[in-house]
């Protein structure tokens, strides 16, 4: 099911400064996944990958040993290395850590939303857990039309050099049914890559399955970026995951075939430079914002009045 069929509207929570920037510049910031508030959440998928990779490593390792002309010597080496199972465990862990290390360095870039709630009060007033995160400064929720957002993403992809853009729901760690439905088909694309990597290790030669791994790794990076701890399930999070094309992916094309490269921008946060991209900035089109919810604040009515002045002449409701 498409996100737009499940959620007619998406909620993006932000500060006053963030809201003004979004309205004035007609764009949304997507932050590099390594600089999210909790990057460690991207490691949640590791155990699932080990479950996927271990039987493949075991099978390929067994084939290598059984087919080796000096099988007895190889088995002796394995036995002195704590045994076959321990070697498989070690190689599986090394392989999975290597997969994380080789995720494309320039992406994905992520923008987060909350999907509609089954509780109409929350849809009308915003989510309390989100408002708490803004403390005394208060916050705002921009309510987007999901279908129109999807159409704008298609235009963004067609106009600029991306390898992939998607708008999809987060999968939470206690939802095995959705994991199997959404992630297993994608992660299965890694099977050929894993088999090729093990053959590389055993035979010392580059396997074609390893050379042609871009799509498999893009699927892995997408799953990694959309898998989240069950403790956040209330948020019904939906994410834009954008993969700007990197130069190597465009080599070999004539200049006339190249789309303009997506500009990367940086902002300072806690003394560090954080890379991000500005989605929709070059489309010269208003964002599909239907209304803005003003969060709890001691001067809430004044904020509502200020917003109405700012949005005069637009169709955005407050």
Give the role of each language-model region:
Residues 1-318:
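Partner-binding and oligomerization surfaces adjacent to conserved cores of proteins
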């Amino acid at each position: 099911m498409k996100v737009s069929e499940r959620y007619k509207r998406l909620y993006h929570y932000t500060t006053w400064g963030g809201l003004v920037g979004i309205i004035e510049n007609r764009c949304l910031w997507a932050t590099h996944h390594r600089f999210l508030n909790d990057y460690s959440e991207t490691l949640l998928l590791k155990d699932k990958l080990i479950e996927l990779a271990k039987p493949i490593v075991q099978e390929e390792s067994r084939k290598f040993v059984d087919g080796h002309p000096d099988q007895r010597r190889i088995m002796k080496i394995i036995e002195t290395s704590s045994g076959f199972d321990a070697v498989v465990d070690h190689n599986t862990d090394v392989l999975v850590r290597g997969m994380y290390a080789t995720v494309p360095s320039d992406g994905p870039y992520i923008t987060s939303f909350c999907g509609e709630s089954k509780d109409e009060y929350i849809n009308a007033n915003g989510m309390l857990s989100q408002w708490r995160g803004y403390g005394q400064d208060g916050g705002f929720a921009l309510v987007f039309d999901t279908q129109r957002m999807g159409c704008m993403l298609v235009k963004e992809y067609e106009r600029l050099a991306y390898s992939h853009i998607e708008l999809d729901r987060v999968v939470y760690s206690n939802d095995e049914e959705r994991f199997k439905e959404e992630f297993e088909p994608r992660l299965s694309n890694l099977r050929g890559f894993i088999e090729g990597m093990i053959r590389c290790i055993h035979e010392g030669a580059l396997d074609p399955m390893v050379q042609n791994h871009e799509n498999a790794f893009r699927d892995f990076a997408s799953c990694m970026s959309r898998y989240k701890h069950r403790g956040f399930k209330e948020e019904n999070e939906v994410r834009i995951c954008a993969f700007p094309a990197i130069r190597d992916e465009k080599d070999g094309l004539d200049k006339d075939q190249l789309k303009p490269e997506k500009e990367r921008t940086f902002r300072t946060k806690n003394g560090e430079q954080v890379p991000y991209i500005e989605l929709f900035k070059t489309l010269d089109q208003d964002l599909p914002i239907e209304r803005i919810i003003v969060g709890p604040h001691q001067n809430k009515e004044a904020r509502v009045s200020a917003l109405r002045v700012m949005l005069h002449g637009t169709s955005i409701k407050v």
